Amino acid sequence: TTIDIEVASDDGFPKPEFAEYPVITISCKNNIDDIYHVWGMGEYTPDRNNVVYYECADEAELLLSFLAHWHNPSNCPDVVTGWNTTFFDIPYLINRVTKVLGDEKAKMMSPWKHIRERIVRDQHQNENQTYEITGIQQLDYQDLFKKFAYTYGKQESHKLDHMAYVVLGENKLSYDEYGSLHVSTSLTSRSL
C-alpha cells in the first residue's frame, strides 16, 4: 500500500513532530487490486473507476474514516510505501491522530495496536522522529532511492519534485498552477 497525506499549511513545510496543521487529504493505493482510496473534505467526484473517494465533514471524521479502513484486516497492509513516509507522512499522521483523537486511536495504525516512537539522526546529525508500526514494514522510496539509485548519479536534492524530473521528466504538481489543496481535493485524481 502506498500512502500520501496533504496538510493545510501556509507556513512552509510542516514539522511532523508537532503536527500543528490539519490533515486535509489522505490517499492510499492498494497495490493488489490497484484501487486508490482517497479521504478528503469537500465535494469531489472521481473521474476514474479505480478511485474511491470518502467525503468527510471535518478532520476528525477524515481521520476516523481512514483509521477504520486501515485497521480492517482486509485492508491493513503488510508493507507501506511512499516518498518520505518514514520522516513525514507516518509520523505526521500518527502525531496528528494522537492530537485530535487520542493515543488509543493512533495505535490503530498497527494491526496489533502497537506503535513505537524512535528518534534517529540523519547525515547532518539532526534528530528526526519516526515510528515503528508493529505488523507493518515501511519502505520509504526516498530512502531507497538514496541507497540504490546510483545509476542516476549523485543528486543535488532528493526532494520529490527534483527526483520526479530526473526519473520521469515531469515535475510535481504546482500549487500555483493548479490552485490550493485547501480549497479543493479534485487534484487528488490528477496526482494519483
Question: What are these language model-derived features?
Answer:
Residues 1-79:
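Conserved RNase H-like, two-metal-ion catalytic cores of nucleic-acid enzymes
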